[in-house]
């Protein structure tokens, strides 16, 4: 039979014939024969031919080597474009055609060629003689791969062993110990088993947020099936996870995807209930395939089988995707029984982490302390709001362990410091030795360098040996742990197979020996650690977890682990370094923060919400900045919104984002996006009385529930923010009684009346505290001038110019800048006018240059600037 018509062959078979011609040319031969065709057939290790040979217990690599040796012995003619068909290949292809007819297939396929090769007298029988196979054995393995399917089109290979190709056997992975242990979730697993045991519509769908453990429930079921801890209807069943992605991948032509899916479903049906399918991301099934013209929706292929109970299927999807894709298709939805999977509590998460601890220790070759597991659960629940337990806690432990492993395998910091110092000394030595005339001091320096190099080299050698020794002990412990883990899996497999003799040998022989070796190595490591001279640490601690949380969220790690009591006791003194006066305001803010941190308020509300009332320039915004710097170690943790920008009704939507269909919908809101990206910040709503009344409807949610929902349906968490609103309402009443304490209550009542007349009661009722800021006195202004002058001092320091000022000059500036109506802002303008402007002119005129000391004093014309101070008083020494 001449292989000239590709329509008689399947695509893969014709591809093999074309490829065999390249092999002939590579061997510089002219006759295309059986050996070239079979070499092309088994060249791809994932091909159908290799799978068939594997089932027949034929090693394809050994077969390839024998065929290559046979081909090498054939006649070579050099390079030739013209090829001839060998007689034995012609006979083999005729035999393949006969086999096709006998098997009632439509096209000559790879398996027909392979079966014909077994009976080939020239090559086949000779090569296969050593493998102890015959055509019956090959035919049996073909039947095992093909099942009951016929070759009805030119791409039948995609339908063979469809489940093996497009699925992952979870029960097989459970047998070999590749699945992580699943702790808890008993109610959900029992509900899944209950639904699977029904006569019809026996298809549970696991619905829950991402990361709560839906896939883990399917893996737990696989482990229970393997252990026999299931009802009779599920015993000895296979749980196979279907990969929709690989099912779609490469399906180029119309109907090709449906063919693959039908092949999978046929295998499941033919198993007579022995196979349970698990479809992760179930929503991907709906609409899959229907994008091709005339193609069917994969969901529609599943519906009849799901309803009749022929297909037992477990689905898993998130709440949003279930609503978006599956609820729309009511016919598909009613065939699934919903099993809701909630986020576990912190206590349950700790139990889950304890169950997984050993797996992560073996993988990373580190130890994980129990306090680290508790910290991972509690800190992730408190600080990582946009993800779910237990996934976020597991990720924390995994990353902390990976970081520690990286430290173990990297060179220790002490050793790196010695390496760098040695390099510096070597360079200095070369530089000094290169001088033509070496002076006596230089010789002494060279001798000192050589002595230091000798000492450091010895120390480097000792530290290097110690590091390598510790590393070897840790690696040995890791290998023994892995061996111990593998032995435990073998013991479980032996016990399941009732091979109690083998189980006893492994448990009381090998396992005990490995455990003794591991304990000896751990004792050696403990001895090294007890001497206090270890370079490497091998335990993940609470501090490591906190450091990872800090990297994820931006909270400084030292703040996270600092004693809460000590931190809160320092709050007033820290705020007073930046905010002068306003004792009542500082104390009120500090008290509210203390209440929140001591757990004496609702954890579902913001840390604190304050309404700062008072005239302009008295420190309302500065207190918010100081609070941000103290709580979050950065001024940029302040999210500042000028509420005068939200005076019109249409601008209110900018806070949480434009509604769908409007310009800017994709961009999100200015308030919601700022807090979503920086969930740990002080939110300052400046001049809040200028905002449109509708703004306060949004703020009600924030102040009461600690969260808002933006225009895209995302929940933004405000529980870890401090909300500060400033207002000038009633400031005229505060100015009227400045410095008079007797009228304070009257003034406060007037301000509160003004406040109540402007803001609605439900808004004021949700604010933690309304704080009145007093007008600044002269003595307070004297303190503020010192803070303001430090800014000038830092500007001059950049130009290497010193700056000193007399107390009289300070008093002059206070006099010029004091205005109780405008607060501290005129003081800044006075400094700019009286100091910065003249200094700028004098620096440009070169009156003062780098290295000078400027002394500022008062004279009859105002302020004088001289280069040499008669009495030097620095800014920090100014007294009021």
UniProtKB/Swiss-Prot annotation:
Location of the region described as NBD2 in the Swiss-Prot/TrEMBL record: 564-775
Location of region: C-terminal: 776-880
Region described as Repeat 1: 9-74
Residue ranges that the Swiss-Prot or TrEMBL entry lists as coiled coil: 394-530
Location(s) in or outside the cell: Cytoplasm
Principal location listed in the UniProt entry: cytoplasm
Function: Part of a stress-induced multi-chaperone system, it is involved in the recovery of the cell from heat-induced damage, in cooperation with DnaK, DnaJ and GrpE. Acts before DnaK, in the processing of protein aggregates. Protein binding stimulates the ATPase activity; ATP hydrolysis unfolds the denatured protein aggregates, which probably helps expose new hydrophobic binding sites on the surface of ClpB-bound aggregates, contributing to the solubilization and refolding of denatured protein aggregates by DnaK.
Protein name (record): Chaperone protein ClpB 1
Annotated source species: Nostoc sp. (strain PCC 7120 / SAG 25.82 / UTEX 2576)
